């Protein structure tokens, strides 16, 4: 990992002291990779989906010029925390309207630069605040009031084209919440997802 996300030794040490347990992978491919050391026959569809996902997203305008420089791996708690703080410091996601396309861009970037399976960015169901299922990911989805329907917002505001894809009809934004590093709220509220 090195200096990819920068150094913040005090915060990192405090977080590591709080979490001496390893995180559990969320997706089936990540679970098989951690438990069995590779993809098994029951995840062949998943690995094909990963390859198809990568092929679909590298041909778009948002594509990336390189294939993964590291072996494929599941998202770990440390990597998720480092990525969250990196995106917060660089002004990445905090306050942006959530859309599946933006989430796919982030998944594709992580797949191509870090070799992380694109199954890590999942959230609890709505309505209301959606908490990340991946331990260490410090961005939750918070519902906001949709902007006013004046001509300027219809033409320019990203919520008009991205906020309508939520099954509950809510407009969601990413919010950074450092308390998610200390407490896994998704596991507390939805233990059935972690059996």
From Swiss-Prot:
Annotated region (Acidic), positions in chain: 59-61
One example GO MF annotation: GTP binding
Motif (Di-leucine internalization motif) on chain: 155-156
Region span, Necessary for MHC-I internalization: 7-22
GO cellular component terms, semicolon-separated: extracellular region; host cell perinuclear region of cytoplasm; host cell plasma membrane; membrane; virion component
Membrane topology value: Lipid-anchor
Subunit (UniProt): Homodimer.
Function of the protein: Factor of infectivity and pathogenicity, required for optimal virus replication. Alters numerous pathways of T-lymphocyte function and down-regulates immunity surface molecules in order to evade host defense and increase viral infectivity. Alters the functionality of other immunity cells, like dendritic cells, monocytes/macrophages and NK cells. One of the earliest and most abundantly expressed viral proteins. In infected CD4(+) T-lymphocytes, down-regulates the surface MHC-I, mature MHC-II, CD4, CD28 and probably other immunity surface molecules. In consequence infected cells are masked for immune recognition by cytotoxic T-lymphocytes. Decreasing the number of immune receptors also prevents reinfection by more HIV particles (superinfection).
Protein name listed in UniProt: Protein Nef
Organism of provenance: Simian immunodeficiency virus (isolate TAN1) (SIV-cpz)
């Amino acid at each position: 990992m090195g200096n990819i996300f920068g150094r913040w030794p005090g915060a990192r040490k405090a977080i590591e002291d709080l979490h001496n347990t390893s995180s559990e992978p969320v997706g089936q491919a990540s679970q098989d990779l951690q438990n069995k050391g590779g993809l098994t026959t029951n995840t062949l569809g998943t690995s094909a989906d990963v390859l198809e996902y990568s092929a679909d997203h590298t041909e778009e305008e948002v594509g990336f010029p390189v294939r993964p420089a590291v072996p494929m791996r599941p998202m770990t708690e440390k990597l998720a925390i480092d990525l969250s703080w990196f995106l917060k410091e660089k002004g990445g996601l905090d306050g942006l309207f959530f859309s599946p396309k933006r989430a796919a861009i982030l998944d594709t970037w992580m797949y191509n630069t870090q070799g992380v399976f694109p199954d890590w960015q999942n959230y609890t169901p709505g309505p209301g605040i959606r908490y990340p299922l991946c331990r260490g990911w410090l961005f939750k989805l918070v519902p906001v009031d949709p902007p006013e329907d004046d001509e300027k917002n219809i033409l320019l505001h990203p919520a008009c084209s991205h906020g309508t894809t939520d099954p509950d009809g809510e407009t969601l934004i990413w919010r950074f919440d450092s308390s998610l590093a200390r407490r896994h709220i998704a596991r507390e509220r939805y233990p059935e997802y972690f059996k």
